[in-house]
């Protein structure tokens, strides 16, 4: 019994010595990477801290985890007996061989374990490196996304700022455009008002000018009519009575019989003929005014107004004033020089000479062409109008002046 206690103490001392030779206990034992059985202690190598192994009680248990128990007889024989040729020694020698095999197997298992530990360590290192790489990539990715998010946010803010600035510029430009347009509209209204005022002034001036011209025309026509009336009254024949009233007519008739025609006669004939043709409607109109109730004149006037273009009010006023002056002049002329009183009978006998008769007929034809009231054959001789040419000249002059004013004002 005492020998066993001593053996255990020796084994403990031996184990302590082994532990102190480059190894150390794992503390706490629960951190051991392998499970030691039968009271084995877990130790780690100082040079390789990741390598763990089990220290068994010497002579009691063996194996990489202290799982093999050593027989007690072998232990007692080894501790108490000497080396003899006793059969027990042979058994002891055989047990030592088994122990060597067990140690060899332990070494192999230890090497395998070390290899596994190294492989596991390598894998763990690779895993750590892989995890580190992944963490680094993750951090880089997170940093990239942070930077990208910040950049996009900055771009969005910049775009929003540009949009706001563009909107402000557009509003300012729109306000300027509205202000310019309002100014242009105001200037246009002012110009339009000035133009209308100038047009009104021009129209008023034109109306005043036309009124002045109309008054001047009326005055000139009245003055000219008065002059012509005075001239006609001065040139009127004064008859003393009896047979002495016809010498001038006889002389004039002799001139026509002789075929004597001057240039003045031709001019008067042509002018009188043209003027008579132009004034014939006016004379007929004046006769219609004196003879009937004016219905034909109104109808003819309506037809003429339908055929012609519309006349301005100023021209109508001027034409009405001229017509009034013209009608007044015709009435005055007819009153002062009645046609019935100017007729007389030619008591001279007819000439028998065919040449004289031919010349007389030619003169009569010219006189008839020139005057509407020509010579007419009566029961006692030829009837002539004494004042017809003078009246026609006065009426022709008045009509010509009136027509000239009318055409000048209308066209």
From Swiss-Prot:
Keywords: Disulfide bond, EGF-like domain, Signal. It comes from the Eukaryota. Residues 267-276 have a biased composition (Low complexity). Residues 237-266 have a biased composition (Acidic residues). The keyword Aminoacyl-tRNA synthetase does not apply. Residues 100-230 have a biased composition (Basic and acidic residues). Residues 78-312, 337-375 are annotated as: Disordered. Residues 1-21 form the signal peptide. Residues 28-67 form the EGF-like domain. Residues 78-97 have a biased composition (Polar residues). Disulfide bonds join 32-42, 36-54, 56-66. Gene3D superfamilies: Laminin. This is Uncharacterized protein T05G5.1.
């Amino acid at each position: 019994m005492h020998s066993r206690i001593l053996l255990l103490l020796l084994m403990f001392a031996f184990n302590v010595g082994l532990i102190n030779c480059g190894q150390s206990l794992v503390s706490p034992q629960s951190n051991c990477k392998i499970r030691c059985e039968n009271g084995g202690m877990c130790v780690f190598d100082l040079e390789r801290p990741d390598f763990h192994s089990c220290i068994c009680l010497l002579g009691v248990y063996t194996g990489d985890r202290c799982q093999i128990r050593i027989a007690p007889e072998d232990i007692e024989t080894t501790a108490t007996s000497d080396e003899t040729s006793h059969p027990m020694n042979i058994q002891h020698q055989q047990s030592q061989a088994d122990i060597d095999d067990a140690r060899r197997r332990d070494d192999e298992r230890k090497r395998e374990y070390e290899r596994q530990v190294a492989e596991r360590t390598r894998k763990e290192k690779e895993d750590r490196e892989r995890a580190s790489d992944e963490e680094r990539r993750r951090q880089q990715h997170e940093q990239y996304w942070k930077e990208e998010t910040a950049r996009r946010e900055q771009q969005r803010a910049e775009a929003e700022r540009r949009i706001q600035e563009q909107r402000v510029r557009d509003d300012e430009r729109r306000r300027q455009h509205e202000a310019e347009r309002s100014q242009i509209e105001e200037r246009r209204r002012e110009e339009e008002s000035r133009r209308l005022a100038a047009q009104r002034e021009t129209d008023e001036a034109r109306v005043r000018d036309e009124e002045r011209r109309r008054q001047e025309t009326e005055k000139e026509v009245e003055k000219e009519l008065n002059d012509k009336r005075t001239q006609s009254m001065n040139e009127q024949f004064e008859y003393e009575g009896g047979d002495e009233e016809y010498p001038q007519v006889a002389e004039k008739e002799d001139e026509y019989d002789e075929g004597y025609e001057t240039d003045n006669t031709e001019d008067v004939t042509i002018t009188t003929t043209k003027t008579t043709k132009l004034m014939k409607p006016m004379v007929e109109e004046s006769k219609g005014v004196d003879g009937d109730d004016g219905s034909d004149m109104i109808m003819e006037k309506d037809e003429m107004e339908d055929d012609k273009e519309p006349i301005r009010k100023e021209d109508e006023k001027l034409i009405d004033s001229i017509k009034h002056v013209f009608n007044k002049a015709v009435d005055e002329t007819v009153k002062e020089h009645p046609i019935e009183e100017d007729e007389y009978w030619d008591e001279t006998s007819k000439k028998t000479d065919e040449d004289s008769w031919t010349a007389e007929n030619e003169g009569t034809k010219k006189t008839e062409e020139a005057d509407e009231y020509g010579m007419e054959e009566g029961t006692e001789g030829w009837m002539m109008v004494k004042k017809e040419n003078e009246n026609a000249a006065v009426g022709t002059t008045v009509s010509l002046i009136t027509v000239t004013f009318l055409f000048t004002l209308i066209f």
